[in-house]
UniProtKB/Swiss-Prot annotation:
Vacuolar carboxypeptidase involved in degradation of small peptides. Digests preferentially peptides containing an aliphatic or hydrophobic residue in P1' position, as well as methionine, leucine or phenylalanine in P1 position of ester substrate. Glycans are attached at N217, N512. It comes from Botryotinia fuckeliana (strain B05.10). It catalyses: Release of a C-terminal amino acid with broad specificity. It is found in: Vacuole. One of its GO terms (molecular function) is serine-type carboxypeptidase activity. Keywords: Carboxypeptidase, Disulfide bond, Glycoprotein, Hydrolase, Protease, Signal, Vacuole, Zymogen. One of its GO terms (biological process) is proteolysis. Residues 1-17 form the signal peptide. Residues 18-132 form a propeptide. This is Carboxypeptidase Y homolog A. The gene is CPYA. Its EC number is 3.4.16.5.
Length: 546
């Protein structure tokens, strides 16, 4: 669903935005124990990673010291891996389709030089894909053809759940879109029912048709990833974006092999929030395979976290009235954020330079506390500056609880072929694991220039979001170093509008790069502005212009 507000490292579900979350009141100002004691204890609990200390500065070491002193219980729980979800694997005979990666790898063809080579690139032998036909009349989510199932990594005991909806229009010719929610650790099925899918769910668990569903003119795959998110499960774990990318490439390859009727259409990846990390990595992984059956044409990132060094500078302006909405914070809090920014940027730069867990984790901890903490303590919704957080047990949105109730119904799980015992919209252990692997602050924006050389990229942002705000997204797209930077920065901003002439935002575009600001939308643009989001999606899928 969204970027979880992990403002501290967290010993439990502190990645959520509940009042009980331990946000440092004065980040890293005081110490009550000798540094050597703190360092010794933190190293004892994290000793299995001492080989990764390359690039760690004294400043980063000091952050680890201070965190271990302030939150000793959190350090003890920094295990980096989530607990396996209870599950029962169904016999192969219960599935309508099974495609084996080993069978794909066994197909060899002759190239133009007369040499033998594999028809499709990639290490796929350990993967299988299971699929079943979903009876639309059983669930009532949509009337279109649907498939659900799992991608299985038999070697590492990982099982990713997906749910596919055909286009409502012309599935034989309409494009296919993979949708990814963020977190990290939030299920893409929340995107299905809360934002852009065929139906929404009310408090009585009744379904309501969404006339602005993104499958109006495209087939859509909703994927629960990484493992142990949503209906996905594993005996092992994934705690970094790069590892997750291998799984996504395998899923798409096997899916399009099983269902070749969708493989010839244009394919696009879209997502929001932490998908600002996922999508550059997943896209680069796909594009690295020259012999593939994935017809990737473009990517879309909504309110993403992609370049922390640039984006974190814009938390203070967004919270203090410079983002087009009234200020949430007072002058003293705004000044404190300004004062903390140089240290935050220094830590992030060190992370960028070394990409070491020992440098990237302190950057995340310090900057999240200093830049998100003051806003979070007000009780305002971090996903929408226009209001308070109304339901702290469900990341401010009660509908998340309704979605979880619906997806925990036995008849729903049976029809979808679900193999886990329960569904949660977000797995906070996954969020913690990615944080402790240093994944949060890594410079994945550096992959974007290589992507732009091959396919178009759309960065869009609802302008009422705080946590991945439009100011920061606009700034990193302007700052990105790529051959088209000069022309992109000089491009004129144009109005984004519906056919009726109603203005829904602004955008600028040059070459393969487009940035769009969506008016009156928070973190989840399709939820807040459903008509506008479907309109710009259809325009983009048609010819990559808005």
């Amino acid at each position: 669903m969204k970027l979880l507000a992990s403002t501290v490292l967290v010993g439990a579900a502190a990645a959520s935005i509940t009042p009980q979350q331990q946000v440092l009141q004065n980040p890293f100002k005081s110490a009550t124990k000798p540094v050597s004691d703190a360092w010794s204890k933190s190293m004892e609990s994290l000793g299995h990673l001492t080989g990764s200390m390359k690039g760690m500065t004294a400043e980063a070491k000091a952050i680890w010291d201070e965190v271990s002193m302030l939150f000793p219980e959190a350090m003890e729980k920094a295990a980096f891996f989530s607990e396996p979800k209870p599950h029962t694997r169904k016999p192969d005979s219960t599935w309508d389709y099974i495609v084996k990666g080993a069978d794909i790898q066994s197909v060899w063809v002759e190239n133009s030089k007369g040499e033998k080579e594999r028809e499709i690139d990639g290490k796929l032998e350990q993967y299988n894909l299971r699929a079943k036909k979903v009876d639309p009349s059983k669930l009532g989510v949509d009337t279109v053809k649907q498939y659900s199932g799992y991608l299985d990594d038999e070697e590492d005991d990982k099982h990713l759940f997906y749910w596919f909806f055909e286009s409502r229009n012309d599935p034989k010719n309409d494009p296919v879109v993979l949708w990814l929610n963020g977190g990290p650790g939030c299920s893409s099925l929340t995107g299905l029912f809360l934002e852009l899918g065929p139906s929404s769910i009310d408090k009585n668990l009744k379904l309501h048709n969404n006339p602005y569903s993104w499958n109006a003119n495209a087939s859509v795959i909703f994927l629960d990833q990484p493992v142990n998110v949503g209906y996905s499960y594993s005996g092992s774990s994934v705690s970094n974006t790069v590892a997750a990318g291998k799984d996504v490439y395998a899923l798409l390859t096997l899916f399009f092999k099983q269902f070749p009727e969708y493989a010839k259409q244009d394919f696009h990846i879209a997502g929001e929030s932490y998908a600002g990390h996922y999508i550059p990595v997943f896209t680069s992984e796909i594009l690295s395979h020259k012999k593939r059956n994935i017809n990737l044409k473009s990517v879309l990132i909504g309110n993403g976290l992609t370049d922390g060094l640039t984006q974190y500078e814009h938390y203070r302006p967004m919270a203090c009235g410079d983002g087009g909405w009234p200020a949430v914070l007072g002058a003293s809090e705004c000044q404190a954020m300004d004062n903390a920014l140089p240290r935050c940027q220094s830590l992030i730069q060190n992370c960028y330079d070394s990409e070491s867990v020992w440098s990237c984790v302190p950057a995340s901890i310090y900057c999240n506390n200093a830049m998100m903490g003051p806003y979070q303590r007000t009780g305002q919704n971090v996903y929408d500056v226009r209001g308070k957080c109304e339901d702290t047990s469900n990341l401010c949105y009660s509908a998340l609880g309704w979605i979880s109730e619906f997806l925990n119904k036995a008849d729903v799980q049976k029809e979808l072929g679900v193999e886990v015992s329960s569904y949660d919209s977000c797995n906070f252990d996954i969020n913690r694991n990615f944080l402790f692997q240093g994944d949060w602050m890594k410079p994945f924006h550096r992959l974007v220039p290589g992507i732009l050389e091959q396919i178009p990229v759309l960065i869009y942002a609802g302008d009422a979001d705080f946590i991945c705000n439009w100011l920061g997204n606009q700034a990193w797209t302007d700052a990105l170093e790529w051959p088209g930077k000069k022309d992109f920065n000089a491009a004129k901003t144009k109005d984004l509008q519906l056919e009726s002439g109603h203005k829904t935002g602004t955008f600028k575009s040059s070459g393969n790069f487009t940035f769009a600001r969506i008016f009156g939308a928070g973190h989840m643009v399709p939820m807040d502005q459903p008509e506008a989001s479907l309109d710009f999606l259809n325009k983009w899928l048609n010819d990559y212009t808005l």
